[in-house]
From Swiss-Prot:
Residues 95-113, 127-139 have a biased composition (Polar residues). The lineage of its organism: Eukaryota, Metazoa, Chordata, Craniata, Vertebrata. Residues 65-83 have a biased composition (Basic residues). It comes from Rattus norvegicus. It comes from the Eukaryota. This is Oxidative stress-responsive serine-rich protein 1. GO terms for cellular component: nucleus.
Amino acid sequence: MKSEAKDGEEESLQTAFKKLRVDASGSIVSLSVGEGTSVRASVRTTVDDTKPKTMCAPKDSWHGSTRKSSRGAVRIQRRRRSKSPVLHPPKFIHCSTTASPSSSQLKQRSQTEPLDGSSGRGISTPKEFSTGENSTSLDINHTGAAIEPLRSSVLRLPSESKTEELSDATQVSPESLTANDLSDFQSVSKLSQGKPCVCVGKACQCKRWHDMEVYSFSGLQNVPPLAPERRSLEDYSQSLHTRTLSGSPRSCSEQARVYVDDVTIEDLAGYMEYYLYIPKKMSHMAEMMYT
């Protein structure tokens, strides 16, 4: 009877150990056969303790393997396969933007500080600036709430005396600029004339705006006069255009061909080559597509 009971205990212990998952980090329980019913009870309690853990544990943590819990939530973008460079638009860096005070400080100073210097003109310079830059504020006592436009103040600047320009070069605060004034490139470039350059003492790296030449495409105004044979050709084509004997009007391409000159076409082609980045070599796939 005792041996049968022991065999039954061994079988139950073996089945319990098969069902039980023992962690590698946990303590390994060594059981001897002759410990009796107390061992059996303790094994049962451990089985009951660990069973819900294994049932509730997610499948990601089985066998020490870590799997992504969120599958398609965030996907990493692949590298670009084509080796062509990414062309970014050019960034225009102004010379002294780092030292300029914030607009809120400008507003507070223009409202609170006492005004001196130019009472008649409506432009006044504040007494002290930490950055050494000047801005115009409104003379509230004399001119009310009227803001002078940018161009008038720009026109007045060269008429001032040179000492005044050197000491207090008046500039327009960004609050008084409207969209019309900012659209004019020349007036915007006049804003930075009185500001000191950041790189003092070194070789000046940054070009000033007002020294720069602006390219303006004025619509072929400076085209040289045509050769006499061309002029006669043009007159002949215009006379053809005016008289309608056949009754059928000419095609659009013929009408356009009259007014286009070879010189202008060459000029425009050079302009395109100079200002646009056109890669010389095509990629292999593009060559295969076009051939």
